[in-house]
């Protein structure tokens, strides 16, 4: 399933696998002046190819290497031989061989699918990408992944944030994210001159500074409360229940890979093997 929305010269694609007539676990990509920022998941690659058929596409820029952002790379590049794909240097091994370098849990295979390999070139922090009308700058923003980039157009005040910025108040985190790096990266972009924020997993923000300030304040406050309870001897499971509420559907679907527990562990800079209360809904604390 694919829907499009125009924001001036920026065309937004919302993409999701269709299950029982509905799109599930959406991701977002953008087209602007010959550049595609991310390409969605493998399950929607055919629809994306069709949507791009009449458009002049010069290059793809991936904000990071997760499967729901690179899934259209291979098919689109195959359709347009020689099409340049750019990504952070740490992302290139994944793009070249996704099956080997980024094994997927069952839920990720089901909702987004295995990406095809593609050929890509490196783009590092501070690199400039010029199009006919715009000049973009890559900004390294790790945390959601080690290879995460944002794309900034200073004259327009546009910032394409990939999955660095997500909407709402986070109650769960994936096991391989780093929450403190996410906060640091959010702070690094907050000082930019911004008019519009184009996220990979949220609605477009027309008041980006306020959105970023609110997100940072929430995450820092939550982190402070996690650390305080841990200092007082609370177990991870009890902290998760106290601060993040009851069980979430996503915890069941992902078998705990994306959970309240993982968010608490990330704040504590601990791994699952470091604690002895593996069940987030058992008592403790």
Name what the model sees in each region.
Residues 79, 180-236, 242, 246:
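Divalent-metal (often Zn2+) His-rich catalytic cores of metallo-beta-lactamase-fold enzymes
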Residues 44, 65-71, 92-95, 146-148, ...:
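Active-site environment of divalent metal-dependent phosphoester hydrolases
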Residues 46-129, 217:
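Active-site HxH/HxHxD metal-binding segment of metal-dependent hydrolases
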Residues 115-175, 258, 264-268, 275-284:
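Mobile, glycine- and charge-enriched loop segments
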Residues 37-40, 58-66, 85-89, 140-143, ...:
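Active-site neighborhood of phospho(di)ester-bond hydrolases with catalytic His/Asp-centered motifs
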Residues 4-7, 91-140, 145, 154-155, ...:
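Metallo-beta-lactamase
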Residues 1-55, 150-162:
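Conserved beta-strand hairpin/beta-sheet module of binuclear metal-dependent hydrolase folds
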Residues 229-285:
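C-terminal regulatory/interaction regions
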């Amino acid at each position: 399933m694919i829907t499009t929305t125009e924001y001036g010269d920026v065309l937004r694609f919302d993409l999701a696998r269709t299950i029982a007539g509905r799109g599930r676990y959406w991701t977002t990509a953008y087209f602007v002046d010959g550049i595609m920022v991310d390409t969605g998941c493998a399950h929607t690659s055919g629809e994306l190819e069709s949507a791009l058929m009449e458009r002049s596409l010069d290059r793809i820029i991936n904000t990071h290497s997760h499967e729901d952002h690179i899934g259209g790379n291979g098919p689109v590049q195959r359709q347009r031989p020689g099409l340049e794909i750019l990504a952070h240097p740490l992302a290139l091994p994944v793009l070249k061989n996704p099956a080997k370098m980024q094994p997927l849990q069952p839920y990720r295979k089901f909702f987004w699918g295995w990406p095809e390999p593609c050929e890509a070139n490196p783009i590092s922090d501070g690199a400039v990408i010029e199009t006919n009308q715009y000049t973009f700058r890559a900004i390294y923003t790790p945390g959601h992944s080690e290879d995460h980039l944002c794309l900034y157009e200073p004259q327009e005040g546009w910032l394409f944030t990939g999955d660095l910025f997500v909407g709402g108040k986070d109650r769960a985190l994936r096991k391989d994210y780093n929450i403190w790096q996410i906060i640091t990266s959010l702070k690094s972009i907050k000082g930019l001159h911004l008019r519009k924020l184009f996220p990979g997993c949220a609605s477009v923000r027309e008041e980006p500074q306020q959105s970023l300030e609110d997100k940072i304040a929430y995450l820092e406050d939550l982190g402070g409360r996690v650390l305080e309870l841990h200092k007082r001897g609370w177990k991870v499971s009890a902290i998760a229940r106290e601060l993040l509420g009851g069980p979430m559907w996503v915890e069941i679907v992902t078998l705990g890979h994306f959970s309240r527990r993982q968010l608490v562990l990330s704040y504590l800079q601990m791994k699952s093997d470091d604690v002895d209360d593996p069940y987030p809904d058992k008592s403790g604390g």
